Swiss-Prot record:
Subcellular location: Cytoplasm
The organism of origin for this protein: Pongo abelii (Sumatran orangutan)
Predominant location category: cytoplasm
Protein name: Methionine aminopeptidase 1
N-acetylalanine PTM sites in chain numbering: 2
Cofactor(s), names only, from the UniProt record: Zn(2+); Co(2+); Mn(2+); Fe(2+)
Enzyme class: hydrolase
PROSITE patterns: MAP_1, ZF_C6H2
Function in brief: Cotranslationally removes the N-terminal methionine from nascent proteins. The N-terminal methionine is often cleaved when the second residue in the primary sequence is small and uncharged (Met-Ala-, Cys, Gly, Pro, Ser, Thr, or Val).
Family to which this protein belongs: Belongs to the peptidase M24A family. Methionine aminopeptidase type 1 subfamily.
Segments forming C6H2-type zinc fingers: 6-59
Binding site for Zn(2+) 3: 220, 231, 358
Amino acid sequence: MAAVETRVCETDGCSSEAKLQCPTCIKLGIQGSYFCSQECFKGSWATHKLLHKKAKDEKAKREVSSWTVEGDINTDPWAGYRYTGKLRPHYPLMPTRPVPSYIQRPDYADHPLGMSESEQALKGTSQIKLLSSEDIEGMRLVCRLAREVLDIAAGMIKPGVTTEEIDHAVHLACIARNCYPSPLNYYNFPKSCCTSVNEVICHGIPDRRPLQEGDIVNVDITLYRNGYHGDLNETFFVGEVDDGARKLVQTTYECLMQAIDAVKPGVRYRELGNIIQKHAQANGFSVVRSYCGHGIHKLFHTAPNVPHYAKNKAVGVMKSGHVFTIEPMICEGGWQDETWPDGWTAVTRDGKRSAQFEHTLLVTDTGCEILTRRLDSARPHFMSQF
């Protein structure tokens, strides 16, 4: 760390003189960030590093090359970045949509860095919350509403529709149900849902690219209502797709459902990855390792951690009253991923397609309840597109 003029340490609760500044902040041009010692710096790292991410994201947005299509849409906003596949972002993004003040908001909604302090307080713990009957009813409600919103998005999937238009509809549908769209400002995510097209594994940011015939697109919805989050996603076909896309999406859904069939008290969370990877590999596909299922209730992401790959080291045994997601991401090629310069969009390193399905589950005495199931059909939407 570089020596600087004397300042007051920025660690919460410390008023010592600070003579050291974070070297990364100096490099990124972030003002302030003074600490009295390496110990204070390390103790503040979990929160402090978010400043780096935000600064990098803002820098990436400024590094705009020449316009490459007609009008005001830029399909190459990050000069020099080598894309892994054919998909390109369509910038600039539309402005972040407001949420009315009467809608109850999670703790990160108005945080300048989008940080959830309630999640940070429990970071690193492996203790899994047992939900009360009141908690369970809260989860049933928000998951049912999240399903309604995903079904609205499903009805919009066709060539020519932009993911920005889907996000707009999702945002309005959340507000109409007195819900906050959980992704919005979660660690500064700029939209109300995630839309992941073709080689995008997850966390795709809705933009003005029209969906094209032959695409596959995942829409990931999470709602917040009365203090609880409900989370689900599905992958859809855009018009007519090739046989490879059909097999990938079908297999991904089967991976999810086979894992769900194993959920009951006494099962180790690590076992789910063995089930998922066995089925994926039997069909010639790979399983993403960087992103996992998670506990969910009053916190968006919490224990347990639920990896989808085999021989993982996940901690915990299922008990009645646990609520968590399973959301396998299955790839045509290799499982390795990288992230676009926007800091969010995860893509396959080889540029091949990836699909995903997700449900929020409640462990019961004899098995599990799929809280985000369709109420009008036992089939996912893509099966109606065959």
